[in-house]
Amino acid sequence: MTSKLNKIGVLTSGGDSPGMNAAVRAVVRSAVYNNIDCFGIYKGFEGLIIDDFVKLNARGVNNIVNKGATILKSARSLEFRKKEWRKKAKTNLDKYEIDSLVVIGGNGSLTGAMLLEEEHGIKTIGIPGTIDNDLVGTRCTLGYDTALNTAVNAIDKIRDTASSHNRLFFIEVMGKGSGHIALNAGIGAGAEEILIPEQNMGLDRLLGSLKKSEKSGKSSSIIVVSEGEKIGDNVFKFSSHIEKNLPHYEIRVSILGHIQRGGSPTCFDRVLASRMGVHAVDCLLSNQSKVMVGIIDDKMVTVPIEKAIKGGQDLDKDLVRVCDIISI
């Protein structure tokens, strides 16, 4: 059954991810295709509160499918965590007669969308826009593939200089408690060790592994480390321990940081964003809401937002096994 929609709002929230622009473009053009007015909201939930809205049309989103960042900007809004500011957001949405909202972001952003619907009846659809790949109900989140490729390209370059100087490099990648980037980028770049939160390796085991590698003839090594709660927490802890116990190693630390969030999205992320954006509007038209769109077995699916934001996505056990076998 097709639902009658007044107007649709779209925003990007939280940490940016490559492909957000392509998703915004798809939402806007899908709305226009279905004769529905679409408004962009600047700076995420902050824009909902301060009334920073702009009406968008098909031509207004020209030539952004290939661009990184987000034309709508993004922000983390502490105010939106409070009921009184969510009520203010509803007042502003009513001002523009917007009754449906597509939120592109990670678990915090989707939580905000869910609360807005539960408290004020605004129909919400989530698009998983985060490089961390840590949401339940989708094989890939938007921007994850681009971040992986960025990380692998950077590690490849570090590998060159590590080999030239017989150095041991600890390289930190993003993930916010999720090891997906570290595991896949580490395998793709041929890392000797990959340290992820889901597999607590321990300092002594890492020490033994490096000694074994040295005996087998390895003169340089790459160790990929998933970030902790704060940037550098894990990578400096591991590197300091090895430096104390293997002082003959020449050790360097490299934190890839925010380059993983930037850059032109890969073809995979552009196509994924386009599919997710169209599917988000389709969901609203079919009277679905408070769900996140995702991709499973190359098919568009939906999952309740409440489920999507809980737990995190399990690592592929076969990939962990592959890593153990080929990193000797």
Give the residues covered by each predicted segment.
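Glycine-rich oxoanion-binding loops at beta->alpha junctions
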Residues: 2, 48-103, 108-109, 142-149, ...
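N-terminal phosphate-binding or glycine-rich loops at protein starts, especially the Walker A/P-loop
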Residues: 2-49
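Short, ordered loop/turn segments at secondary-structure junctions
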Residues: 13-16, 41-47, 76-77, 106-107, ...
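Short glycine/serine/threonine-rich phosphate/pyrophosphate-binding segments
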Residues: 17-27, 49, 82-87, 101-114, ...
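A glycine- and small-aliphatic-rich helix-loop capping segment at beta-alpha/alpha-beta transitions
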Residues: 25-34, 54-60, 115-126, 142-145, ...
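Accessory alpha-helical/coil subdomains and C-terminal extensions
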Residues: 38, 103-105, 111, 115, ...
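C-terminal non-catalytic interaction/assembly regions of soluble proteins
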Residues: 240-328
